[in-house]
Design a protein with these regions (language model features):
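Beta-strand-rich domains and repeat architectures in extracellular enzymes and scaffolds
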Residues: 49-84
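Surface loop/turn motifs at the tips and blade-to-blade linkers of beta-strand repeat domains
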Residues: 51-56, 99-107, 151-155, 218-224
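Short, conserved, GDST-rich strand-edge loop motifs in beta-rich repeat architectures
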Residues: 74-80, 172-195, 243-245
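Loop/turn-rich, solvent-exposed surfaces of beta-rich toroidal or solenoidal domains
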Residues: 220-245
């Protein structure tokens, strides 16, 4: 009986060892593939600093560079669904974590999918719109504090990405079949016959209020699915970054 138990234990150990070995081989193979497939990226990439909060349940979604003081802002959400923080990394490496209160005083617990800034305000994506936060409040917030959003601006979808580029506010939605659907009128067939299932709005600056934007878009761009970022190059070309999973 003891011999049978010993044999069963030995077989189990061998099976577990084989499974672990296969898993390790798969991880190594994946790392090698990633290094080879994305070699041009890794050749040029730098690692200036670690993403703050990454090991505390914080799931980062966006970042923005504040030129005024050379700091970085990180938005995202918490895996445990607690209020969503914003991390600020100062030029000297000091990390500050603070929170955002909605205009009604309730805590912001949104996805934090996008944050972008100009000299006067920070704009933080929320459900069906974005929040407006005075930059002075944000830049001087103490660790653990809460900054007050002065307004929520409504949009007819929840922005998945948002960026201030060349004086205009760009924001768009994210499409992935079944999981992240978009309104039917956002689905447009392009001249080559493919379908773009999402849109990006471009809001012009508000001439009556420095740092703010008009609430009716100047332009609406038809874009592919799975877009999570955008910028405009110096020669006026629009760049879209795509990712999922």
């Amino acid at each position: 009986m003891a011999a049978k138990s010993h044999r069963a234990l030995k077989i189990t150990s061998i099976v577990i060892g084989v499974i672990v070995g296969i898993a390790l081989i798969a991880v190594v193979a994946l790392n090698i593939y990633m290094r080879v497939a994305f070699a041009p990226f890794f050749d040029r990439a730098e690692s200036p600093f670690d993403i703050p909060g990454i090991n505390t349940g914080f799931v980062p979604q966006d970042l923005d560079h504040v030129e005024a003081d050379d700091s970085w802002l990180f938005s995202g959400y918490m895996a445990d669904h607690s209020p969503s923080p914003i991390y600020r990394r100062a030029a000297d490496g000091t990390i500050t974590k603070f929170y955002v209160s909605l205009p009604d005083g309730s805590p912001y617990d949104g996805h934090g999918s996008a944050i972008t800034t100009n000299e006067q305000y920070a704009y933080l994506a929320c459900e069906e719109g974005y929040l407006v936060i005075p930059m002075d409040d944000l830049l001087f917030a103490e660790d653990g504090a809460s900054v007050q959003a002065i307004e929520k601006v409504d949009v007819d979808f929840s922005p998945a990405f948002m960026n201030i580029e060349q004086g205009q506010l760009l924001l768009g939605n994210f499409y992935y079949p079944n999981d992240y659907e978009t309104p039917e009128n956002h689905h447009i067939t392009t001249p080559d016959g493919t379908e773009n299932p999402a849109v990006m709005y471009a809001f012009a600056a508000d001439p009556a209020e420095p740092g703010r934007f008009l609430t009716v878009p100047d332009n609406v761009f038809s874009i592919p699915g799975m877009v999570q970022g955008t910028c405009i190059t110096a020669d006026g070309r629009i760049v879209l970054s795509v990712s999922y999973g």
